[in-house]
């Protein structure tokens, strides 16, 4: 899991409302009353995207937006780069090294273009690759649009292909690659731009489970090396708990709980969240602190309170001595 740089915010959502329709403002009073999406649509004809969403995301963090289909997670994600309109509230984005907060919904066309080219990159569920181009041409496409030097682009593409294990496929057409390999090309293209913020909208959900697991591992490896800020959309709880340093769970366009995987598993904020976590495997989430009490038996082997339970089980299998926190 990526560890956030403390007190170094890079994306902020402040009471964000997104409504689709010809008269979105007509839905605001009903949002304030806590009405549901179906109630708002029946009364106003407008479709609620997200309601009163507030989040602060730190540089280097992996935050997962999770929920069922239609919960608003992709809608909120696409507000970061101005793809979905914010009717009320504010989204602000900061580029590391630039002491400037920029609102993609209230900035000039030139500033928005700069944000999309240099600050924020995006990976979709559908790979969006150009089939008439080679693998290396697809990886370098964002750099080409940004007008980067050809020699520098070639070197950057070479580095990214090596990172995702596709160096030997650089000259191949993307149509010759499997789905998993094509998504690696999408990852390489996103990371090649060096944009500090990466938006990932269910990028692995259409893949076979084995390939999906492998790409999750590869993403974590890339993140450990490149340390980007990632906002990742998923409807898969195991995926969310594996990737996210924090998880924001959404229901009906609203954020119902945001916390670490351990916090969400141990203290679900609502029956909806409790139902999500009821059948998950807790071994990757819980630590010794959660399952052991502090004792002081002499001669007992001690472990740190944050030792994962999975590691603790292996230690118990390797010793007949007591283990204490």
Annotate each language-model stretch with its function.
Residues 173-177, 181-183:
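Conserved ABC ATPase signature
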Residues 81:
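Helix-to-loop junction immediately C-terminal to a conserved catalytic motif
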Residues 192-196:
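A short, proline-enriched helix->beta-strand linker immediately N-terminal to the Walker B motif
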């Amino acid at each position: 899991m990526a560890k956030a740089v403390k007190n170094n915010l890079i994306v902020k959502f402040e009471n964000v409302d997104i409504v689709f329709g010809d008269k979105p403002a007509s839905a605001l009073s009903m949002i304030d009353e806590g009405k549901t999406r179906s109630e708002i649509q029946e009364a106003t004809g407008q479709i609620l995207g997200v309601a009163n969403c507030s989040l602060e995301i730190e540089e280097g963090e992996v935050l997962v937006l999770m929920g069922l289909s239609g919960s608003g997670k992709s809608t909120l994600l696409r507000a970061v780069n101005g793809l979905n309109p914010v009717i009320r509230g504010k989204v602000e984005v900061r580029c590391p090294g630039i002491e400037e907060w920029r609102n993609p919904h209230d900035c000039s066309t030139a500033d928005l273009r700069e944000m999309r080219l240099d600050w924020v990159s995006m990976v979709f569920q559908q790979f969006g690759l150009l089939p008439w181009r080679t693998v290396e041409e697809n990886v370098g496409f964002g750099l080409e649009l940004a007008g980067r030097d050809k020699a520098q682009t070639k070197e950057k593409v070479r580095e990214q292909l090596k990172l995702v294990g596709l160096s030997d496929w650089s000259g191949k057409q993307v149509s010759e690659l499997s789905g998993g390999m094509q998504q690696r090309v999408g990852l390489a293209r996103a990371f090649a731009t060096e944009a500090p913020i990466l938006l990932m909208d269910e990028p692995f959900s259409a893949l076979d489970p084995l390939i999906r697991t492998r790409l999750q591992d590869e993403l974590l490896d890339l993140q450990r090396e490149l340390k980007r800020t990632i906002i990742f959309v998923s409807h898969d709880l195991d995926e969310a708990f594996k990737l996210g340093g924090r998880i924001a769970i959404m229901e009906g366009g609203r954020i119902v709980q945001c916390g670490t995987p351990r916090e969400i598993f141990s203290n679900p904020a609502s029956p909806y969240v409790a139902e999500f976590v009821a059948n998950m495997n807790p071994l990757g989430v819980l630590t010794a602190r959660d399952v052991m009490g502090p004792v002081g038996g002499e001669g007992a082997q001690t472990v740190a309170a944050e030792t994962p339970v999975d590691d603790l089980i292996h230690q118990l299998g390797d010793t007949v001595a007591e283990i204490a926190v």
